[in-house]
């Protein structure tokens, strides 16, 4: 993906 948002153990 182009985004680098990580939450807990999930990166989107």
Curated annotation (Swiss-Prot):
UniProt GO molecular function: hormone activity
Tagged with keyword Secreted: yes
Any Pfam family hit: Urotensin_II
Keyword Disulfide bond part of the UniProt annotation: yes
Residue pairs linked by disulfide bridges in the UniProt entry: 6-11
Superkingdom of origin organism: Eukaryota
Job description of the protein: Has a suggested role in osmoregulation and as a corticotropin-releasing factor. Probably involved in smooth muscle stimulation.
Family (UniProt): Belongs to the urotensin-2 family.
Protein name per Swiss-Prot or TrEMBL: Urotensin-2
Organism, scientific name: Polyodon spathula
């Amino acid at each position: 993906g182009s985004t680098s948002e990580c939450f807990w153990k999930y990166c989107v």
